[in-house]
Amino acid sequence: MESTEEQQQPVAVVEEASPEIIFRSKLPDIAINNTLPLHRYCFERHPEVADRPCLIDGATGAVLTYAEVDRLTRRLAAALRRAPLGLGRGAVVMNLMLNSAEFVLSFFAASRVGAAVTTANPMSTPHEIANQIAASGATVVFTEYMAVDKLPVKANGGLTVVLIDARRDGCLHFWDDVMASVPDDEDQEPEEAAAGFDPDDVVALPYSSGTTGLPKGVMLTHRSLSTSVAQQVDGDNPNIGFTADDVILCSLPMFHIYSLNTIMMCGLRVGAAIVVMRRFDLARMMQLVERHRITIAPLVPPIVVAVAKSDEAASHDLSSVRMVLSGAAPMGKDIEDAFMAKLPGAVLGQVRAVPCHARPSAPNATGRFSPFSCLLVSFGLHFFSFMLALLDFASCFMCSFLIF
């Protein structure tokens, strides 16, 4: 007789791939214009918010408006095309820096010239950075003084280094050398058609954490990232309801896809203000929430736990926060409850590794109730305009369902 433990193990019903076992979202599809370059998609609504804050420096309070961000990315794109950088379609640049306005400008400037950006943690080891540069084929690195000594020495000037903060021999300075090299009348990008743009070109090349081996480059195209942004913030009933009136906290590293996609790209798409923290600090984060009346706080479970256990929350007015997103790892209900006691006016949504609604059988991240019910042990409903298949790794066939 089988033991109780054995009886409780799920059994996959495996079939060869067929249309019947491709699961479509129960939510209606939305129109997605995913043939645009990523920068055009994210900046599409900028004329409506041109004079509003786009990037707010959490350390200094300095503000760049949407019009200024658009102008500066155009200017930097013009500089990337010129000597000595000479970048174009198919080139790869590396963003090796902590959160900053320069990170955003360099990312979208690369998109404008048809290049891809590989993002890297400046706290990585020299060996890890060298491997990523070699594997990705990056020829230009945007970085900061603290990380420049970690870069490999390439013969014949094969690697151009651009520093965003201090000056150093052998390196270009972001503002004084690169941006200043472009005359005021030459900061317009050419038409993508003339540059041979294709929506299936790679625009972002973040690296995995290496949980199944060495870190691997993840090739993300203009089409795939535009689609991802649309599935989060577009449509009449967006899954993550960011608006142009929101102020979004960016305390998570932009070199990670969560911050890069959900905070930076989605925030820019809707015209929200983004408060940029160079790196996370709990006390500083709460000060910024109070000072800038932050409404959206994308976090990760360790930060959620830190807030839940902190007495500092009582010393700050956090009432402006209406939505908290937690991603990268799941959380238990006890942690959620302890955290929400500190922010009773906010909605908490857990963002999963696959596109899905924030919490099953509960309000999603927009604060709306889902019209569909599902088990609490499930990961929720998947996004609109999305199809899902379950794969049995042992057979490489798709599973039609699970029997318990």
Place the predicted regions along the sequence by residue:
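N-lobe entry segment of adenylate-forming
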Residues: 1-83, 113, 193
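Structural core segment of the AMP-binding/adenylate-forming
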Residues: 2-11, 105, 112-181
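ANL superfamily adenylate-forming
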Residues: 19, 24-25, 140, 146-199, ...
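Conserved AMP-binding/adenylate-forming
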Residues: 58-63, 79-126
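Conserved adenylate-forming
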Residues: 83-88, 182-201, 205-250, 270-272
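ATP-dependent adenylate-forming carboxylate-activation enzymes
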Residues: 97-98, 115-133, 145-148, 272-292, ...
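Conserved AMP-binding/adenylation subdomain of ANL enzymes
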Residues: 226-247, 255-296, 310
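Gly/Ser/Thr-rich phosphate-binding loop
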Residues: 269-272, 294-299, 308-371, 380, ...
